[in-house]
Amino acid sequence: METYLQTVRDEWIQLINETDSLVHQLTAQLASDHASGLITEFYRVVLADPHVAEFLTTEQVERQLQEALRRWLVDVLSCRVEQVDEQIRAQQRAADVHARIGISVDLVEMGFRILKKLLLPLINATPHPSETKLSIYHYAINSIDLAMEVMSRAY
């Protein structure tokens, strides 16, 4: 594995290992419980952008992309140490697909930003103490950022 990917792999493993197991569990559960709604809202926002509409149709989103993104979100936010290598490969494959169909890295990054923005109200609506909510958000955002970094690098 190249040095860069080894560094990201090590950071991802460190993030998982340093995250309280309850926070990891709550984050995975949040993703599982709310992924479909998050993804529906995500595509509502994304498809309103005229530049994105050049690449995606509502039919494509409904037929293929919603389920793929739902699975991606759940997989990233529930990733365990033994799954990190597969997650890195999954991000590289996702980058290949995005590049092949002509979706630029800036649009992918916009999508990540929107997804992270949509997570905050969901986390804040949970009944957990503020410190736990902050830990969930920290873990979720850093997990998404690591996935995004691998994906961007693969472009």
Which residues does each predicted region cover?
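Long, amphipathic alpha-helical coupling/dimerization segments that relay conformational signals between
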Residues: 1-6, 10-19, 23, 30, ...
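Exposed alpha-helical structural elements
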Residues: 11, 21-25, 41, 51, ...
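TRNA-binding/sensing appendages of the translation machinery
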Residues: 28-40, 44-45, 50
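Residue-level detector of well-ordered alpha-helical segments, enriched
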Residues: 34-42, 65-69, 107, 111, ...
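Structured interaction and signal-relay segments at domain junctions
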Residues: 42-78
